[in-house]
């Protein structure tokens, strides 16, 4: 059965969307329709900011202890609904169910409980020499979040902002939004004051840009692509807003000559393939001694076989499908680019895993003999693709690691 959500959470209540336009959410494991959500408008984004601005004075004047109590109740409700949330995120994102419960739900639950504690313990005012430092909430925060760890990224932003005394307008990713609706249901259930938390779904160029541009938005916290982050910063600069950006990555994993190679390679590959490589801090560049390259390659091929994806709900693999058809094609294009530029494909490739032709699956893929000037060594792929780059000296290894736009 398709999940249908047709309202936004604004000023403490569910408000029916004005536009009939909707956005489809697909099941990553099958490609089938999973849910539909409303496509928000500029007017609805503005209404959410106005509600947050109206609620700010009262909320910022509540005691940190009281704010912490709200956060703790939210944490408890998330824990109560952990099975439901894990299933939702496994369907939306494709992370296997067991990992989804521990990571995609466990970490958000912890984020709210930890910020509840911090709110009560935080030093809001202190004397330093002849000066008094007073820490005050920033104001209305626009939180714009990605799809790869959807509820966790939401929770990190929302919990911290609420603990600080800020009010929030959330725009979750339209690719994986149902978990955000459940969080809004929980926030409504615990009785958070009206306007303190608001949520509008929709497209970034419409809802996201409206939130960033609104004169009553005081701060923007954005996690997503570098391209979108540049756009957020440019719009926010027009009104000199505070901006926090967490963008892309192409992290290097240097393995030294005297390392325990089997252990280091296996650990590095898990940190590359976690969440099917859809992690901004994934260790996607393995920089290894040239003298041990052949050994590393053999271990990488054998280890990759243990990461062959399976259905995120019923399977037992450590990885599942990619989030969408768009992401699947993007990863395939990068694999083809690696082949075209002369990297040596030692396992994986663009062919779907056997028996997983439906859904958005890609084989775990390893390239060796990769040079730093190759596209796959420079650009964020966001899929289960590892580049092995050999080095001759430790100085060269460091230079390789630093040869990145990130």
Segments from the language model and where they lie:
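Short acidic active-site motifs
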Residues: 44, 206-207, 396
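Long amphipathic alpha-helix in the N-terminal Rossmann-like dinucleotide-binding domain
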Residues: 49-50, 69-83, 95-122
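Rossmann-like NAD(P) dinucleotide-binding subdomain of oxidoreductase/dehydrogenase enzymes
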Residues: 124-263, 391
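Short, structured beta/alpha segment
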Residues: 1-91, 262, 339, 391
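Generic non-transmembrane alpha-helical segments
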Residues: 73-77, 81-84, 182, 186-192, ...
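ALDH superfamily catalytic-core signature
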Residues: 219, 227-371, 393-395, 399-400
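Residue-level signal for inorganic ion chemistry
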Residues: 31, 67, 89, 112, ...
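Conserved glycine-rich beta-strand-loop-beta hairpin in the small C-terminal domain of fold type I
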Residues: 359-362, 379-385, 404-406
């Amino acid at each position: 059965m398709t999940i249908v959500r047709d309202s936004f959470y604004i000023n403490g209540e569910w408000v029916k969307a004005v536009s009939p336009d909707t956005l489809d959410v697909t099941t990553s494991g099958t490609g089938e329709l999973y849910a539909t959500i409303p496509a928000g408008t500029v007017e609805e984004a503005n209404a959410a900011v106005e509600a947050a601005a109206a609620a700010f004075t009262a909320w910022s004047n509540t005691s940190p202890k009281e704010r912490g109590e709200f956060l703790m109740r939210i944490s408890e409700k998330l824990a109560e609904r952990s099975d439901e949330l894990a299933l939702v995120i496994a369907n939306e994102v494709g992370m296997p169910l067991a990992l989804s419960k521990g990571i995609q739900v466990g970490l958000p639950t912890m984020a709210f409980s930890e910020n509840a504690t911090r709110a009560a313990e935080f030093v809001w005012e202190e004397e330093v020499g002849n000066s008094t430092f007073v820490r005050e909430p920033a104001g209305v925060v626009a939180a714009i979040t990605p799809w790869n760890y959807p509820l966790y990224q939401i929770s990190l932003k929302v919990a911290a902002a609420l603990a600080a005394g800020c009010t929030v307008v959330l725009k979750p990713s339209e690719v994986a939004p149902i978990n955000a609706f459940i969080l809004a249901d929980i926030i409504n259930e615990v009785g958070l004051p009206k306007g303190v938390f608001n949520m509008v779904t929709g497209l970034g160029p419409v809802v996201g840009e409206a939130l960033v541009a609104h004169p009553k938005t005081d701060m923007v916290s954005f996690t997503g692509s570098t391209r979108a982050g540049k756009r957020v910063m440019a719009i926010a600069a027009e009104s000199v807003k505070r901006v926090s950006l967490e963008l892309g990555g192409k992290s290097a994993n240097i393995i030294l000559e005297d390392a325990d190679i089997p252990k280091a390679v296996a650990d590095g590959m898990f940190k590359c393939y976690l969440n099917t490589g859809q992690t901004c801090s994934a260790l996607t560049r393995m920089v290894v001694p040239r003298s041990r390259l052949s050994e590393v390659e053999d271990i990488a091929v054998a280890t990759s076989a243990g990461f062959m994806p399976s259905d995120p709900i019923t399977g037992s693999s450590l990885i599942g499908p990619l989030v969408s058809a768009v992401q699947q094609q993007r990863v395939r294009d990068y694999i083809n680019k690696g082949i075209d530029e002369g990297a040596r494909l030692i396992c994986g490739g663009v062919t779907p895993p056997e028996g997983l032709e439906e859904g958005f699956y890609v084989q775990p893929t390893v390239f060796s003999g990769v040079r730093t000037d190759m596209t796959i060594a420079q650009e964020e792929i966001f899929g289960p693709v590892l580049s092995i780059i050999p080095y001759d000296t430790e100085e060269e290894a460091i230079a390789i690691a630093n040869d990145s736009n990130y």
